[in-house]
Amino acid sequence: MKRGNLKFFYSIVVAILCLTNAVAQQQKYTAPSLSDSNSWSIIMLPDPQTYQKFERNQPLFELMTAWISENIEKLNIQLVMCTGDLVEQNEMINPNGIAANQASKQQWASVARAFGRLDGKVPYVLAAGNHDYGYSNISVRRSNYNTYFPVDKNFKTQKIIREAGLNAEGVPTMENAAFEFTSPQGRKFLLLTLEFAPRDTIVAWAKNVTNQARYKDHTG
């Protein structure tokens, strides 16, 4: 065997051995499970905005909600929450391909589609962040939130809504809403979503909700 061919042969052998060793050292996948059968889970998702602004990243967020959907029973998932900034730009028409390559309508449609995997399976409570308003970073109060996440989008979420405050356009939406959630053990929780930098009227509305006698024993 010629020297050049011999070097190539040894290189292939070494590569195969390294790959075999790496595979052998990989831990066997263990499916998620609860250590206590009486336990239950709440899933908290951070800002999805960066996943929505580029088309190539959108499947990554769908993978997250798909994982949640597949593990609802295994992890006894009772509720999904999100911190807001569902999109990067609320009203961008022509992306420049650098800051984003998806127009706002495409971003909203993408995040709504991802959460749609959970519709009818588990309730989700989504806050509205500063990027979800105006053209860029709450330049105005208008948001497309209610267009893509109306109250009746997910009947599981609709069942736990107790009150809906008015958005800047005077429409009751889940941008400002009160949710009553009861754990499998019967513990009651009061959850509120408030618009980013809430107006004085919304702060007053939230105080009125939390001061109601029927919520005095709720965890919030």
Residue spans of the language-model regions?
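Bacterial N-terminal signal peptides that target proteins for export
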Residues: K2-Y10
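Bacterial N-terminal signal peptides
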Residues: Y10-T20
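Generic structural signal for beta-strand residues in well-ordered domains
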Residues: L17, S35, E70-E73, R117, ...
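N-terminal active-site segment of His-dependent metallophosphoesterases
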Residues: A24-Q102
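Active-site neighborhood of phospho(di)ester-bond hydrolases with catalytic His/Asp-centered motifs
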Residues: M44-P46, Q78-D85, P123-G129, L194, ...
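Well-ordered alpha-helical segments embedded in enzymatic catalytic cores
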Residues: L63-W67, S110, W205
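Extended active-site neighborhood of metal-dependent phosphoesterases/phosphodiesterases
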Residues: M92-A204, R214-H218
